[in-house]
Amino acid sequence: QTHFYNILENNAAYDFQFNGESTRLKVNIKQVLMSDDWDAVTFQQVSQAAPHFATYEPYLSALADYVRTYLPHTKFYMHQTWAYEAGSERLKNAGFDTPQEMLEHIRSAYQAAADRIGASGIIPSGDAMFKALENGMEIVHRDTFHASLGFGRYLLGLVWYGFFTGRSVKHIPFDAFDVPVSDKEREIAARTAAAVLGTTL
């Protein structure tokens, strides 16, 4: 919804980054779209609304149509958000008893969204965060809803890398973590990402 109104009002509401570095430029969505010949554009719903497909429209379709105006050949993808931490107030306030219940609603909503805009796929970040807990991680959030700065962000990075490149996520040399990630956590992250992507290590 926020991005929809930013388009209508042509708001320069975004910090433009290039290869992860700030340019200190404030830009609008049109400027971002026109800044390169993007081959992929991802969409996601804000986490608290993500389980409820009714909140996606009419904004999602309008945003997709707007992007198509400037990038007629780009592929669309939905970036699946994740469930809140078990036992947290945020989970309770969202109306769910368990993270699994919230994730099931997220999956359904994202599939409906992908179908609605003709997306080429869904980046399974929510599935990865949940699977990591099953694979032995005790904590994947830093504040019950954002990904943890070490393991969580690394896991999500592996999911994106594997999803878009099709390459193995086993031996990734990245080491510039905000919070240390142990060798065991690296192994869990790689195994988890491979599992949700349906690939082998």
PLM features per residue range, with description:
Residues 94-201:
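Catalytic His-Asp segment of secreted/periplasmic serine-dependent ester chemistry enzymes
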Residues 45-54, 85-99:
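Surface-exposed cleft-lining segments at the edges of enzyme active sites
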Residues 39-45, 75-80, 121-124:
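Structural recognition of the beta-strand scaffold that forms the well-ordered cores
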Residues 1, 46-51, 81-86, 127-131:
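Solvent-exposed loop/turn segments at secondary-structure junctions
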Residues 33-37, 70, 115-116, 154-155:
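Extracellular/periplasmic catalytic domains that process cell-envelope and extracellular macromolecules
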